[in-house]
Amino acid sequence: MKKIFLAIVILTISFTTFAGRTDSIPAKHSDVASVDAIINSLYNVISGPAGEKRNWDRMRTLFIAEAKMMATGKRQDGTIGKRVMTVEDYITVSGPFLEKEGFFEREIGRKAEQYGSVVHVFSTYDSKRKLEDEKPFMRGINSIQLWNDGKRWWIVSVLWQSETPDNPIPEKYLN
């Protein structure tokens, strides 16, 4: 009985691990060949007009399987909170909204630091519902951790915070 239980546990863990693997889908080389390429691909894949389905498989190819996506900001009660998601959580939670409402996010500033195969990017963004909108409805900073495995770049994590009146983006992150 113990052997059967152990076999079931091992199979369950194996299936759970491989079912959500983002690195099992081949990436388009031009999406992951450089830091610029992977950052541009990230913004591109979440952006599009209302009614347009996003290429979520393309998004999956940008991230390591264990990647985290986290939003942080001030709650209504004044405390600072966070929401931690997997790539699949992000697609499930944000995907329908982005596709229904329309969403275009673009990079308007970048600061990057590299040590070996690790890069940290502070990527300042603005967001619009339609490309032709005169003003963005939101701005903020994406803190993006990247890793190169010797063949390509991967996104390890994205932590973002939107700008607020009491927390404007410093000028040094806008150029």
Language model features: what each stretch is:
Residues 42, 59, 67, 121, ...:
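Hydrophobic pocket/interface hotspot
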Residues 75-76, 126-129, 160-165:
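Solvent-exposed loop/turn segments at secondary-structure junctions
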Residues 1-24:
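Bacterial Sec-dependent N-terminal signal peptides
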Residues 69, 73, 81-132:
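Surface-exposed, charged secondary-structure patches
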Residues 139-168:
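Short beta-strand edge/turn micro-motifs at domain boundaries
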Residues 80-83, 132-135, 165-172:
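A short, polar/proline- and glycine-enriched secondary-structure boundary/capping micro-motif
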Residues 43-50, 63-67, 71, 94, ...:
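Sec/Tat-exported extracytoplasmic proteins
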Residues 19-61, 175:
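Short, low-complexity N-terminal intrinsically disordered segments enriched in polar/charged residues
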